[in-house]
Amino acid sequence: MNQQLNTTRKSTAARGRMGLVGGILLVIGTCIGAGIFFKSERVLQNMGGNTTLALLVWLMAGITVILMGLALVEITAKAAFDDLALLSWTQKFTNNTFYKACKRFLIWIYLPTTFFFMPLYLVQSLQDGLRGFGVANHFNTPHDWAIWMVIVLLINLWFFFTSGLSVKWTSVQNVVLLLLKVIPLIAVVILALWLGASAEQMERQPVVPVKDFTAISPFFGWFSAMGAIFFAFDGFYVSAAAKTQLKKQKNYRK
């Protein structure tokens, strides 16, 4: 009887998990952060308006992100302690004091701020998109901030509750969000090439000097820009634990 019950539980758990394709899409959707849409202008400002330095920063940061992803693939493919991703690695490779400090930081600071700022970035993207198409991005009331805050809270509550319903439902939501992030990325490249080809017909805007500590010299701006780019891909640490939700995990260990 107990053996039959255990078999039923295992089969139910397996059905609740995602397949390999769903896992790949989850990792891609998590790693492509919405922050990348806000960082290009900031990176250029940190470089003092120097396009060449900005391109070098993006190139170096992109290579670093790829290498970091490959390193995490090696860790998660061969380690049996990745259920909690970063926390599991901290517990395994560091002392107990550092592990507890990391755990408290993630629980009390990182997760609450992430749950707040990610929907806020989504709302900012929506506002920028509406403004770009000439559509009003406000409600024309003196309390617009409160309305947007309610929208952010509703988005938080929606993902907080629906993500825990089932892995399948989470995968569907991830595919939708992935499309919403990938389509603008492709569209931006196409628009940039098209606008670049007709640059002679565009009115050039003067470069306004940035009065910021990070823009005093390219040295400070370089590190500030690196941090801004890395923030857009910080989903690596979360997505590394996705393997625990895959079906037939042993087939994907190597």
Swiss-Prot record:
Keywords: Cell membrane, Membrane, Transmembrane, Transmembrane helix. It comes from the Bacteria. The chain crosses the membrane at residues 18-38, 53-73, 105-125, 145-165, 175-195, 213-233. Its main location: membrane. Gene3D superfamilies: Amino acid/polyamine transporter I. The keyword Cell membrane applies. The keyword Membrane applies. It is a multi-pass membrane protein. It is found in: Cell membrane. InterPro entries: AA/rel_permease1, APC_superfamily. GO terms for cellular component: plasma membrane. GO terms for molecular function: transmembrane transporter activity. To M.pneumoniae MPN_308 N-terminal region. This is Uncharacterized protein MPN_095.
